[in-house]
């Protein structure tokens, strides 16, 4: 058994993990008790990492035009085709689209090639979709992209405000640290500002369920209240302009704008002003807005104005969504940045040209994410290299992105997964290393750099992203500038650039790490930057503007760009769920992570369910002017009337019409370019199909285009849930006949079941009824492993249920131990009255703790019924 200290590849908390690999290859993961981000804690996704390292579905060799190729062939094809486009159309016709999943070394290589040697700044990243407004907010206020807070500040604050953040699900380990800090300090107060009542509200002393998109008005009103209280410092540039705008935002105006009772707002304002220490945690609910940058600055303004900044337990804390979004920001992996916190200014341009030894350096900012794919659609960008991300799923207006890629003359992808919604458009495909195989560094939300270490050999012909970029650079004729042989060399160059001609003028500086030996780099302990060679003082109090001052940015709150009408009367919000990550290429392969929420759902308030005749558990079509999706209805009091919520994760690999981004328009913030993903006007209507069914098969089945399907996680077989309006199953019978399989059919009323066999081996099973068929999926899975050996058992299998089978477990609440609602309900009825008692009896909530808010909700509901 070998053990390797590394980091989790999911959210921006940046947890340390210890990966243990057995001689036969099995991997298990536990939290690293020495890592300062998590001190041994893990969420359910992190705890399941050992179940994601298999090679099923992996891209393991290069391809060119759909045919397997050698590495020399694929690299030569990429180099020659890129060179032809550059020579004919210029460097602006080329673009890279990268990912917060990349390691810093990979990011650095890509940024250097695009900006430094191809000569255009058209390199952007999926981080544009999650935190570019936060970057803009920090740069406008502080003069640099500096996150001025730490996790210890969260634990040591008197008042923690979470706005636009469901940290319990999206940043679960940081949430657990906050929950523990609140238990240790009962005087700590927690305020959650969110239109939805989420799991994060479990520890909230106050929940402000404001109108979607109205956060800016709430914080501008708070600035006015701070000024009125006299607790204000105006020693900042533009302070008077910001205060002048805020003066119009009295309690009545804020209450009307936010849809909140006046007293709730007044109480929150008094609490914030009175708290000796206050910290505000904000994330996608703030950033993903057409006015996200202004909302970020409204938050920063109140912290500056009342002195709750630059000291322990205080500050505006943007939580990043991805494991290395921060690393991408540090290297300059956004089209609006240059490199190492340098900008497109004459001194910085000359400095970077000297360091890189390049005469081709891009001189102006490039195309941001939404702009980039629009330019591809117009034919202006003729080559795009997509690295470690799935923009057909993650960008707004998915259909337009697909159409753009379909028309693009050259699409290159580097990825670990063979089949994605984006990958089907690729002309050249490079197999990249995945977590556990690649080695480098990442930076978490609190500026902490950690090593991500390899503990498995590269599979097939997969290679590191930095290596792929360097070899393509070589094919383009720039090999001498990319002659790295090890990721340590890339990191050293990146670190050296951060300290180059930097005597305290630039905030980002890790020049003190530039001379690490390979052994020292490999053993690098987690460290927060700066790590400078310079003796210049560094402080979050410092303003990084030329005058050295901080700024309060004047903010005029704007209503959401999405407006409802008679045709689209509801506002749609999209976001993360507890057990899935991004587009599910990793987490979707783990059966236990698919138990909690296993298909696209739409959360609806009870009043809206009644108004639009929606039924719990039934399917509904959600429409916008851009498209349509299908999801299962979930009715709950946590949803604000007039609003819907849909998870962002599902895509064409997991469901037909399951992509929420089909519905989103490409509306962006004018300052940051970040899309508005939280507010879209939609309509909803129940869809009652003629039948529903379950399909299990050993091999892919070609489904008619008219069928709606959702893929379930299953090991060794394919499991689909289906629904349709056409009752004919002739297509399935004919397909099974072509395979030469023997069939058993049971038909009666609206029930139609089929088993298909080959030499005694179960190949396919189909169960359908007017409503969801009552089957025992676990028993069916077992029948594929060990087929029933007599006619009676086969007949029972054809019914889908064995005799005496227990009632279904209900929806899984605890994914760690597969504990369902039924068992929890029985334990409550048997006398369990606390989450601790439930954990003692069933183990639920005793591992990662992510399910504890739901355990509390079930306890409250069951005890209220008693």
Swiss-Prot record:
Cofactor: [4Fe-4S] cluster; Mo-bis(molybdopterin guanine dinucleotide)
UniProt remark on cofactor binding: Binds 1 [4Fe-4S] cluster.
UniProt entry tagged with the keyword Oxidoreductase: yes
Domain 4Fe-4S Mo/W bis-MGD-type, residue spans: 1-57
InterPro entries linked: Asp_de-COase-like_dom_sf (IPR009010), BFD-like_2Fe2S-bd_dom (IPR007419), BFD-like_2Fe2S-bd_dom_sf (IPR041854), CT_Nitrate-R-NapA-like (IPR041957), MoPterin_dinucl-bd_dom (IPR006657), Mopterin_OxRdtase (IPR006656), Mopterin_OxRdtase_4Fe-4S_dom (IPR006963), MopterinOxRdtase_cofactor_BS (IPR027467)
Induction data: By nitrate or nitrite during nitrogen-limited growth.
Gene Ontology BP terms: cellular respiration; denitrification pathway; nitrate assimilation
Top-tier EC class: oxidoreductase
Binding site for [4Fe-4S] cluster: 8, 11, 15, 43
Gene3D superfamilies referenced in this protein's UniProt entry, alphabetically: 2.40.40.20, 3.40.50.740, ADC-like domains (2.20.25.90), BFD-like [2Fe-2S]-binding domain (1.10.10.1100), Dimethylsulfoxide Reductase, domain 2 (3.40.228.10)
EC annotation from Swiss-Prot or TrEMBL: 1.7.-.-
Pathway linked to the protein: Nitrogen metabolism; nitrate reduction (denitrification); dinitrogen from nitrate: step 1/4
Entry's family note: Belongs to the prokaryotic molybdopterin-containing oxidoreductase family. NasA/NapA/NarB subfamily.
Role this protein plays: Nitrate reductase is a key enzyme involved in the first step of nitrate assimilation in plants, fungi and bacteria.
CC annotations in GO: membrane; oxidoreductase complex
Protein name: Nitrate reductase
């Amino acid at each position: 058994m070998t053990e390797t200290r590394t980091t989790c590849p999911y959210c921006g908390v940046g947890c340390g993990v210890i990966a243990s690999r057995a001689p036969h290859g099995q991997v298990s993961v536990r939290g690293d008790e020495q890592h300062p981000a998590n001190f041994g804690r893990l969420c359910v996704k992190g705890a399941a990492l050992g179940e994601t390292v298999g090679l099923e579905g992996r891209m393991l060799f290069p391809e060119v035009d759909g045919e397997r190729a050698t590495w020399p062939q694929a690299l030569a094809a990429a180099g020659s085709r890129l060179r032809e486009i550059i020579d004919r159309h210029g460097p602006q016709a080329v673009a890279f689209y990268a990912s917060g999943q990349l390691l810093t070394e990979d990011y650095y290589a890509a940024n250097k090639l695009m900006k430094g040697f191809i000569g255009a700044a058209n390199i952007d990243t999926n981080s544009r979709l999650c935190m570019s407004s936060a970057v803009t907010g920090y740069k406008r206020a502080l003069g640099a992209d500096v996150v001025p807070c730490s996790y210890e500040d969260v634990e040591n604050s008197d008042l923690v405000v979470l706005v636009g953040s469901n940290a319990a699900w999206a940043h679960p380990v940081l949430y657990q640290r906050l929950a523990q800090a609140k238990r240790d300090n009962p005087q700590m107060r927690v305020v959650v500002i969110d239109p939805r009542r989420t799991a994060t509200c479990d520890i909230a002393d106050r929940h402000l369920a404001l109108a979607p998109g109205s956060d800016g008005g709430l914080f501008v009103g708070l600035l006015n209240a701070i000024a009125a209280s006299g607790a204000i410092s105006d020693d900042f540039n533009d302070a008077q302009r910001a205060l002048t705008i805020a003066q119009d935002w009295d309690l009545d105006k804020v209450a009307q704008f936010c849809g909140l009772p006046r007293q709730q707002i007044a109480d929150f304002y008094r609490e914030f002003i009175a708290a000796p220490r206050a910290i505000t945690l904000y994330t996608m609910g703030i950033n993903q807005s057409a006015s996200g940058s202004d909302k970020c600055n409204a938050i920063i303004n109140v912290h500056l104005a009342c002195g709750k900044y630059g000291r322990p337990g205080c500050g505006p804390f943007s939580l990043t969504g991805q494991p290395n979004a921060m690393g991408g920001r540090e290297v300059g992996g956004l089209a609006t940045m240059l490199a190492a916190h340098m900008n497109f200014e004459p001194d910085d341009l000359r400095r970077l040209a000297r360091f890189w030894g390049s005469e081709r350096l891009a001189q102006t900012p490039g195309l941001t994410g939404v702009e980039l794919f629009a330019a591809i659609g117009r034919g202006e960008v003729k080559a795009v290299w997509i690295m470690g991300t799935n923009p057909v799923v993650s960008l707004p207006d998915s259909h337009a992105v697909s159409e753009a890629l379909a028309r693009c003359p050259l699409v290159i992808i580097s990825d670990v997964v063979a089949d994605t919604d984006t990958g089907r458009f690729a002309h050249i495909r490079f197999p990249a290393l995945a977590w556990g195989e690649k080695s480098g560094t990442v930076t978490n939300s609190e500026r902490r750099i950690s090593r991500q270490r390899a503990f498995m050999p590269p599979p097939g012909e997969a290679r590191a992203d930095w290596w792929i970029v360097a070899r393509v650079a070589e094919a383009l004729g720039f090999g001498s500038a990319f002659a790295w042989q090890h990721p340590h060399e890339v990191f050293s160059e990146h670190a050296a650039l951060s300290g180059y001609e930097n005597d305290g003028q630039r905030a980002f500086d890790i020049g003190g790490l530039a001379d690490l030996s390979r052994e020292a780099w490999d053993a690098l302990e987690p460290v927060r930057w700066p790590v400078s060679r310079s003796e210049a003082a560094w402080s979050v109090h410092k303003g990084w503007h030329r005058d050295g001052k901080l700024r309060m940015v004047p903010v005029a709150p704007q209503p959401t760009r999405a407006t409802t009408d008679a045709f689209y009367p509801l506002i749609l919000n999209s976001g993360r769920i507890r057990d899935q990550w991004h587009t599910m290429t990793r987490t979707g392969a783990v059966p236990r992570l698919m138990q909690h929420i296993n298909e696209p759902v739409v959360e609806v308030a009870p009043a809206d369910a009644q108004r639009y005749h929606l039924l719990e558990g039934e399917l509904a079509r959600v429409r916008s002017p851009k498209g349509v999706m299908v999801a299962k209805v979930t009715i709950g009091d946590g949803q604000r009337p007039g609003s819907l919520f849909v998870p962002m994760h599902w895509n064409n690999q997991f469901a037909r019409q399951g992509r929420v981004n089909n519905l989103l328009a490409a509306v962006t913030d004018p300052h940051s370019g970040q899309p508005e993903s939280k507010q879209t006007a939609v309509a909803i209507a129940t869809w009652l199909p003629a039948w529903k069914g379950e399909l299990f098969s050993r091999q892919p089945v070609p489904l008619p285009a008219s069928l709606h399907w959702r893929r379930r996680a299953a090991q060794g077989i394919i499991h689909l849930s289906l629904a349709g309006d056409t009752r004919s199953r002739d297509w399935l019978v004919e397909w099974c006949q072509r395979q030469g399989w023997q069939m058993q059919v049971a038909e009666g009323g609206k029930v139609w079941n089929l088993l298909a066999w080959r030499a005694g081996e179960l190949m396919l099973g189909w169960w359908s009824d007017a409503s969801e068929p009552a089957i025992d999926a676990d028993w069916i899975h077992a029948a594929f492993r060990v087929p029933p050996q007599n006619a009676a058992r086969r007949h029972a299998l054809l019914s889908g249920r064995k005799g005496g089978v227990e009632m279904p477990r209900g929806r899984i609440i605890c994914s760690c131990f597969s504990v369902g609602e039924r068992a929890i309900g029985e334990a409550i009825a048997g006398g369990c009255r606390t989450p601790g008692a439930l954990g003692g009896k069933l183990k639920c909530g005793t591992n990662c703790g992510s399910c504890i808010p739901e355990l509390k909700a079930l306890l409250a509901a069951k005890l209220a019924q008693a």
